[in-house]
Amino acid sequence: MTAEEVDKESDPAIEDVKSDYDAIELGNENENENEVVSLDSMKAVISRASSELKHENDQGEERDLGSVEKDPILERYHAACKQGDMKTLREMVESKVIDLSNDYDPKERVSGLHWACINNRLSAVKYLAGAGAEVNFKGGELDATPLHWASKSGLVYIVDELLKAGADPNITDSQGYNLLHTSVFSSNIMLVIYVLFFVVDGKEDVDQPDPHQRTALQWATYQADALTVENLLKFNADVKNADDAGFTALHWGTVKGSIPVMDLLIKHGSDFFQTTNDGKNCFTIGKELYSIGSLEASLYKNGFDKNGFPLPQYFSASTGKMLTFFLPWVLIPLVFYIFSKITFFIALLINTIVLVISGLVLSRLVVPSYLLSKRHPILNSPLLAGILSGTIAIAFFIWFTKISILTFTEKPVGNIIMLGFFIGLITLFIGLMKSDPGYIPGTVDHDKVRETIKELLSLGKFDAKHFCVHTWIRIPLRSKYDRDSACLISAFDHFCPWVYNQIGLLNHKLFYMFVVLLEISVWWFLPLMMEYFDELEDYLENRKGKHFGDCHFLGDEDLCFGLHHDTFNFLLLCWVIFQAFWVLCLIAVQTVQMLKGVTDYEFVQINKKLKSNGTTTEDIFSSTPPELMSEELIAELDAPALDPRQVPQRTCFTVCCTLLGLDKLVTMIKSVLRLKSDEPSSRSSHLSALARIPTDYGWKQNLKDFWLLPDTSSPLWRRILLPPKDSHALLNGMEVDYYTLYTLPNATEELV
């Protein structure tokens, strides 16, 4: 990379703004020459940006024409700085071959420290700064310091070292950009967070503008960088600041059409009716740039209609959730009743109408009272939990009012046990819905955050894999961030819509006990229902004088009798058995994962890496210098990017499979077969390392870790049956704190 190329990266939005403008003008010309959209509010920005860009290009051409051959000694020195060749660097500096106060070409004015910084050569930067290189030297066409060069490339470790060496973060380049601006240009959230905590916090103004009155927040919104926007807003960046064209952050967000960014800005009070200098609000800009759909979606998520007015709210959030939860308690018996009383096809038509109307009422009137999202609203509502609980409640009601009365004489023990099962199911279900899955509290103590950042920098692990950019804490092993609760969840397993809760460290044992008890209860309920049909037939024949002929349509006389003479309970039995099949799939997956010592989330991630040959779509924002990189990080960064075309698209069928757990069952079977295969693997060594399960300590130890509490003074039955009360649990037989779990017990290498 030449100095010219580095400098031309100075204003990342110049070409993008120009492209946006050209595209909209071209589109309007093609549609109707008389209806050219006016974007006067942006022309000033574009004109200025274009002239700056033209000026840079003209300068570059003039320099190329007038360039002379460079000093070979200086060339060798700069090459050593770029490559981090410490031996050559020391020889040239200590032998006085290179004068650090004059180590640049007079035409380029780019020092060796500049080159070491932009190439992420931490050792070279430390050496040069310690040897007396000027850390605030302004070089290149834009009079940028090494700090500017490093920050534009998102190099956190280099920025940290330069600041330690006395670099001034308040210096601006010739375009008027300070350290915060250039850090935002990099779109590296780790650098932005570092600058916010070590430079801005309590010292500088987070809204310090550039010469065109654009703040860091406005640049971040134009770049559609939701993570940077989120963190700037946490530092109280002003959403209402306008640049010299009258554009606020939301105006720039509308230009790019990023829903997450606009969502954040609207949540923090952005005025979508505020106009630019030529009188255009966000709605006008959205229509001109075809981003109006994204703006309307962002407004909807914040409770506004497409015109920016508050949506009508018919219920409070708690009432809406209650209605959603209890609706299946009414619909399930109603559907069964209609099928049991009316001819099948007419009943099917009526039930379809009932369900469609109920769905429309639910989605239009009820769900928006607590959930303003058009993406999988059913999965994120308590509806499925209502279906499961409603099924249990109806089954209990039928058992208590009909089955137990007719069958208690013949099966007293079975009915008493069934009562115990119902009590256990209801208790566990309520407990699961209200349980804490293991939320790890974040922090707002800036001193603690700075300590965490310093620690991770010293370990070479300050990236999004080890530091949570949302909660500002170090990420423990086996945890995952949950957007709904805005917390990390320890030993995260999965989100279960059937209990309307996340499953993690503190409730995973309860969840497994619940699904196993649910499966046992279904198969215990089946013979009681069969006995009920038999007793009902005898009762009607003996007491009512009715006679029923033989029926073998279903291969069982009792079932056939239930179909024809107690259709409601027959349909209930079929519905309950259907539930048992998907629960059985879930138990199978959970059991295998328990034996392997892995959570569902970890299991899915392992198999994604296996399926994609180690590729990943996740950006961990790592700028770790080569000398601090671990083998694991090198392998992860070297893996090729995943082709988006290889990512399976979600369809209605895949969503249904997800709800029933069938996708997990198929994945588990394929993964077990792959892991058990004796065929030679064609994968590289780093990929085979990704495929291993680091928490698999053998099935016996894995079972002990899952079921036993670490408190050895408690009775064994309490250790087995009770869930953890805090973050302490067993791992490889050792007590660990999952809130601060950064290494695995007896692990041969540090994984976090």
Swiss-Prot record:
Organism lineage: Eukaryota, Fungi, Dikarya, Ascomycota, Saccharomycotina
Source organism: Kluyveromyces lactis (strain ATCC 8585 / CBS 2359 / DSM 70799 / NBRC 1267 / NRRL Y-1140 / WM37) (Yeast)
This protein's domain notes: The DHHC domain is required for palmitoyltransferase activity.
Enzyme class: transferase
Protein name listed in UniProt: Palmitoyltransferase AKR1
UniProt KW keywords: Acyltransferase, ANK repeat, Endosome, Golgi apparatus, Lipoprotein, Membrane, Palmitate, Repeat, Transferase, Transmembrane, Transmembrane helix
Described purpose of this protein according to its UniProt entry: Palmitoyltransferase specific for casein kinase 1.
The DHHC domain, residue ranges: 466-516
Assigned protein family: Belongs to the DHHC palmitoyltransferase family. AKR/ZDHHC17 subfamily.
Keyword Phosphoprotein attributed: no
